[in-house]
Amino acid sequence: MKAIFRSWRYLMTPLVFAGMLGVSSAAGLNPAAVIYKLPDQIPWGPVNAAGAQSDVVVGDPTKPGFYAVYNKWTKGNHFSRPHFHPNDRYIVVLQGTWWVGTGPKFDPEHGTVPMPAGSFVTHFGKQVHWDGAKDEDAVLLIMGEGPATATQVAEEK
């Protein structure tokens, strides 16, 4: 039963957040019943060295338990390097095209597959992958069970 609830939560959460991105106005909502962030209210963090920004939406990815994080890969061929996470992660592409590669050979030009808006991706725990954006920003909703860490791996040439 617990596994069914967890699966249901992972499937419904992206729909809720996708709906939040499409809201144009929401006058008169009771904050005891509903809280929300419109797209222009997302407090994106600074752009990191790989070219991504993030904002924690729910939970704390550094601690045990469920979390959801917005991640924005900025355009301009910005990619993470090959790495893995200890736990499965579930990703919905909300905007743009996200490019995903697997394995220790880093080759953004020939080794990636495009994931357009609406795509759902599972990064399985302890499996090497890398990802990013090419010619447009890519906004993602990443969900999982913390703690969420990343372990870099040696790249193959």
Residue ranges and their predicted role:
Residues 2-15:
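Bacterial N-terminal signal peptides that target proteins for export
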Residues 67-85, 124-126:
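Conserved short histidine dyad/triad with adjacent acidic residue
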